[in-house]
Amino acid sequence: MNKKVLTFLGISFVIIVLDLTTKSLAEKYLADKAIEIIPGLFNLVLVWNKGAAFGMLAEAPETIRKLMLVGSSIIAAVITAGYVFKSNAKLSNLEVLSLALICGGSVGNLYDRFMLGQVRDFLDFYINDHHWPAFNVADASITIGIALFIGYELFWKKRRITN
């Protein structure tokens, strides 16, 4: 197997393990209490999220919500993995990293949705009474992966091709 494919699989695996481990710890230790980490800015608090990242689609009808969320997680994982396996020799290290972050995060949340019917979120950032929706390692991984991929495609790839 190609080095880039192995890197992709390794990073994806680490994200999945990190995500599921932190969610299990959150479920175990935060079930009945929140822990203030940085007063006025950051808490650890268990939130059961039936929606997508940052609570999106939480109010959608259950059947539609489940189909969209499970389907989108499967599609994201399959597309990112397929893209890496098909064009691995042409991918930059940053592209491999960004796609692995997206894939690993998608699989982590897919596990929760499939096995638990909802996702365990626990990272709560806020300023005063204004809270950002709670999220987890998978959500952060997907968001960072998408940002890196878009940034690479818009800014860095052009420079790489012209040099």
Curated annotation (Swiss-Prot):
Active-site residues, Swiss-Prot/TrEMBL: D121, D139
GO CC annotation, single: plasma membrane
TM ranges: 5-25, 37-57, 67-87, 91-111, 132-152
Enzyme class name: hydrolase
Reactions performed catalytically: Release of signal peptides from bacterial membrane prolipoproteins. Hydrolyzes -Xaa-Yaa-Zaa-|-(S,diacylglyceryl)Cys-, in which Xaa is hydrophobic (preferably Leu), and Yaa (Ala or Ser) and Zaa (Gly or Ala) have small, neutral side chains
GO biological process: proteolysis
Membrane topology, record value: Multi-pass membrane protein
Enzyme nomenclature, EC number: 3.4.23.36
PANTHER family given in the database record: LIPOPROTEIN SIGNAL PEPTIDASE
Entry protein name: Lipoprotein signal peptidase
